Design a protein with these regions (language model features):
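Core alpha/beta nucleotide-donor-binding catalytic domains of modification enzymes
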Residues: 2-191
Length: 191
């Protein structure tokens, strides 16, 4: 059992390290979008395990849409303090009458915060399950071939590159890594 636990702990960091080695260069300012959920908690933990990154920080966007939003921000603040990672908590107002659905409006505001504060690279914790879910949703909406691309692993938004190092990792592997490393996370009731 210990051997399989060690291989799980090594698998996620090894895959993230290989992903970043292909797509990043030393000295780039790296920011993690930290919701406090399992995926982003693991991603930030892995980055600290891989070694010191002088330009590593996290951003938590406080949408205020849940009665738990303050607790989530406090959790992220405490987590980053324990890891020794700088954290920016940005409180935002989501325009509910924007013509977008609430989730799409929140996403637009969130990416606005990221583009102002992320630096060179924004790393997000989307995983295989998110990819499959997005693909299915897009196909059901009738997006055709364009929707089959689902979530891009690497894309440019303005001057910021958005990378998703966990996109080929299964949710169960991420959760197993978190349990093996005794990480805690928050569960968003809307997710």
């Amino acid at each position: 059992m210990a051997a399989s636990r060690n291989s799980l702990q090594n698998s996620v960091p090894t895959r993230v390290a290989a992903f970043l080695a292909k797509r990043t260069t030393p000295g780039e300012k790296v920011c993690v979008g930290l919701s406090g959920g399992c995926d982003s908690v693991v991603l930030l933990h892995v980055l600290t395990v891989l070694g010191p990154r002088e330009h590593l920080r996290a951003v938590h966007v406080h949408h205020g849409l849940s009665e738990n939003a303050d607790r989530w921000a406090d959790f992220c603040t405490d987590y980053c303090r324990r890891l020794g990672v700088e954290l920016l908590v940005e409180r935002v107002d989501v325009e509910r009458r924007s013509g977008l659905g609430l989730e799409a409006a929140a996403r637009a505001v969130r990416y606005g915060v990221f583009s102002r504060s992320a630096g060179d690279l924004l790393l997000l914790g989307h995983h295989q399950g998110d990819q499959a879910e997005t693909l299915l949703f897009n196909l059901l909406r009738g997006t055709g071939i364009a929707g089959a691309a689902a979530i891009p692993v690497d894309r440019l938004q303005g001057r910021m590159r958005i990378l998703r190092p966990l996109l080929d990792v299964a949710r169960r592997e991420i959760e197993a890594y978190a349990r093996d490393c005794q990480l805690v996370w928050i569960d968003d009731e809307s997710n």
